[in-house]
UniProtKB/Swiss-Prot annotation:
Belongs to the eukaryotic release factor 1 family. Pelota subfamily. Disulfide bonds: none annotated. Keywords: Cytoplasm, Isopeptide bond, Metal-binding, Phosphoprotein, Translation regulation, Ubl conjugation. SMART domains: eRF1_1. This is Protein pelota homolog.
Amino acid sequence: MKLVRKDIEKDNAGQVTLVPEEPEDMWHTYNLVQVGDSLRASTIRKVQTESSTGSVGSNRVRTTLTLCVEAIDFDSQACQLRVKGTNIQENEYVKMGAYHTIELEPNRQFTLAKKQWDSVVLERIEQACDPAWSADVAAVVMQEGLAHICLVTPSMTLTRAKVEVNIPRKRKGNCSQHDRALERFYEQVVQAIQRHIHFDVVKCVLVASPGFVREQFCDYMFQQAVKTDNKVLLENRSKFLQVHASSGHKYSLKEALCDPTVASRLSDTKAAGEVKALDDFYKMLQHEPDRAFYGLKQVEKANEAMAIDTLLISDELFRHQDVATRSRYVRLVDSVKENAGTVRIFSSLHVSGEQLSQLTGIAAILRFPVPELSDQENDSSSEED
């Protein structure tokens, strides 16, 4: 998705102009457009014309309309999005208040205006427009003194950082200058990895180099991670895959991607993270039921106690027709993040999202039990008996 323009005021009213560039962007757009918004886009309209002789004919014209959105229809198989509404801006072909359906098209821009842009919608735009959020694969291509940190998306390879440090040669009887420079180089590469790689999106980080550079670098990185208790690196250690490359230049990445080990590793999908989160919830429900709850009221009460470690929520809840209900979910997400909890927004198009929908679409894994919640559970089960 390409962001052309963003005009949002301090009161969160405003508009954004976007260009969907691939099928997945239609899914993002479906989650952005809500009833009551105004949508401006190019569309085809059938127009009746009358000739000088009085005969009536019709032809199709391309025009730009601004609709007040009344209905949204998304075809997940064809990735087509149709938006129905009434015309709210003067147009030579369409009367004010007349109904029309716009079919949003790839590579054709649209402008979406809202009275209130909430944090969940703004974050979705940020993720849809930042290639880092669609990059399943990251790569560190390196040699002594030179490293490129790259992100590999379905359509391109992006260089996010280049690290260059002059490494003096080893001298007989004195390697200290060489070793200090090498350590400084490794440290800068580690910092670049942490700055540019989203581990909740990336499923594999290739570390490619000639010789033993990759092994020595990975040893250094994880030793430092243990010393500093760097949980992000330690928890994602299994995602790092060491492969051969002839140099630290970007063009050597192609060799690494052709490695058969890499190909088999990349067969996983982004949905794997959602599957694991839901699996963790079910395990907690089975083994420590006082730390796993679902349903909006229960989850809100757990949040009031600042007990939520991980919030699992379906994206379909943010498409709720009632603005007050939708705002309630947004406030919950914001609050969990403020209390240092993790928020996982599940796609209702994935199997795990469908399973979560069967559990009301919202669930939480707690840091610690909340006695009042457990008591409520017991009360409700005794009432059922």
